[in-house]
Regions:
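Terminal, non-globular segments
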Residues: 1-168
């Protein structure tokens, strides 16, 4: 229970941030930060694959319900949850702990976040557009929203992992 409580709170906080703050930002049509990916990105390194996929499914369905989307969030989040173990094996060889800048190193953690967020955003915005007609516009949305999302997820990760023991 001591391991799950921080992640339940992270789930709730990322959903609330996404729904009440980031979904209401109307700065540009190209800027749509999707920070709820932080939940899947910050799950412990030794999370069993079934739990990882179930967590991704729960987050995706919750965000689809909250945003009124028809499965786009679920598909993108499940893909991120599926790819995450292979990505971590590629970037980081040790077992256990929480993925954070202090454990993985700043550069590796930043690369990890960039790959996860760009993968999520590529699937999300491609499915949202459902057309090749606005390919350049979709690519710009992926890059701009991805960069802003990575910055906010970095901040969330710093706040979330600051209070956790190293091994959690």
């Amino acid at each position: 229970m001591h391991r799950t409580l921080p992640y339940i709170s992270l789930f709730v906080v990322t959903v609330l941030l996404q729904v009440f703050l980031f979904d209401n930002l109307s700065i540009s049509i190209y800027l749509n930060p999707l920070v709820y990916v932080a939940f899947v990105a910050l799950l412990p390194l030794d999370t069993p694959p079934v739990v990882l996929l179930a967590s991704g499914l729960a987050m995706g369905v919750t965000m689809d319900f909250a945003m009124g989307a028809a499965g786009v969030n679920t598909i993108a989040t499940l893909l991120v949850a599926f790819v995450r173990p292979a990505l971590l094996r590629t970037l980081y060889t040790r077992e256990g702990g929480v993925p954070c800048a202090g454990r993985l190193g700043r550069r590796v953690f930043l690369n990890y976040l960039i790959v996860l967020v760009l993968l999520h955003h590529a699937v999300f915005f491609s499915l949202e557009a459902l057309s090749w007609m606005h390919l350049v516009r979709t690519l710009v949305r992926i890059v701009v929203s991805g960069a802003v999302s990575v910055a906010f997820i970095w901040i969330i990760a710093r706040i979330f992992t600051a209070k956790l023991p190293v091994r959690v």
